Amino acid sequence: MVGYKVLITASGLGSRLGNLTKFTNKGLVRIGKKPALSYIIESYPDDVEFVVTLGHYGRQVKQFLNLAYPDKNIKYVSVDNYDGDGSSLLYSMSLCKDELQCPFIFHACDTVVEKEEFDFSSNWVAGHKNGSSFQYRTLNVRNESLLKINEKGEEFFDYVYIGLCGIKDYELFWKYTDEILSETTVSSLSDCHVISKMMDHSEFSVVDYKTWYDIGNVDSLKKSR
């Protein structure tokens, strides 16, 4: 068994894809011959355990994964609020706390990368050299170590953040998740806000992903296809 689990958040509306997600989940949008979720699931070792959040067209997501991957170890977590006041990526992630009392990888369901060997000697975040800071949060880096996560629109940065990270210090992650959600419930809350707090106590390395396909918005989806 590998020593980590993989969290895939597949509960959001995918509103940046417009009409493409009006009748389906963005993780089921196809790139080539397969849905995005297939590329993600198949990029990990056979014996890894997945935790998948369900919300927008969650029944479709669960049915697809159960049919396509009957031998995979997949736990499902239903998100009660994925589009109303108080909803956020971080809120959805927080509902998985009980399932993720171990090191874990967070993998956004609109992020497709080539298969990698994951190192958990430290916490890490994944970056890509090319991308618009107006569409993505960005990373400032020194000697392959994370210095800062920037909000969208930052002019000076080294990488864009691709929605993929490894959390070795999971207890600290959940501690700060609880603290942040107790203070505010704005819809922009994400893993990045927790990582920024963790950096006062833990180091994060930055993994440079040369190949990255983002299906989270219409323009990048067209390029990925």
Where are the regions a protein language model picked out?
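Conserved core of the sugar-phosphate nucleotidyltransferase
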Residues: 113-186
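Conserved alpha/beta core of the MobA/IspD/sugar-nucleotide pyrophosphorylase nucleotidyltransferase superfamily
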Residues: 2-6, 160-225
